[in-house]
């Protein structure tokens, strides 16, 4: 099997799209769609319990700073093992949820989060394949920035137990990647 193959896995979710303010009937300002990608967390050195809200993630807030409106066009979590994962495998649990969900990363482990999934990274069987888990945009509010603040924007939960033989450097990581539509530029000082 080719170890460079990407495994794409959909998450089960409840279709409950967020509502947004209605747009005025006047001419809209131009919009630009930009890509983004950042490392959300790493695994393999200790127990990891991460909650990453896209609305407040530093790389996203920097990207959206000069605009009044920001809306997710597409987004995915990318689980990437390193070569160290082959000899030191680990299990990662993850789920996309609305930011106002009371779910925690450790609850995915106990299968208490609908759509939560577990992935084995590394080892002899799964080797070092990259796994993509797309965000279902029909289960969260796409608007990250608007005239009001929304509480049901996307949040990624990720958990991994402390490894039996912890590595000094991470054996895997999660990147969040996607595209975001930015509109209505603000006047800002240089």
From Swiss-Prot:
Domain of life the protein comes from: Viruses
Family designation: Belongs to the tymoviruses capsid protein family.
This protein's name: Capsid protein
Cellular component, GO, one term: T=3 icosahedral viral capsid
Keywords tagged on the record: Acetylation, Capsid protein, T=3 icosahedral capsid protein, Virion
Membrane-spanning parts: none
UniProt cross-references to Pfam families, sorted A to Z: Tymo_coat
Cell compartment(s), UniProt: Virion
InterPro entries (UniProt xref): Tymo_coat, Viral_coat
Keyword Acetylation set for record: yes
Function recorded in the entry: Self-assembles to form a T=3 icosahedral capsid composed of 180 copies of the capsid protein. The capsid encapsulates the single-stranded RNA genome.
GO molecular function, one term: structural molecule activity
Positions of modified residues (N-acetylmethionine): 1
Provenance organism: Belladonna mottle virus
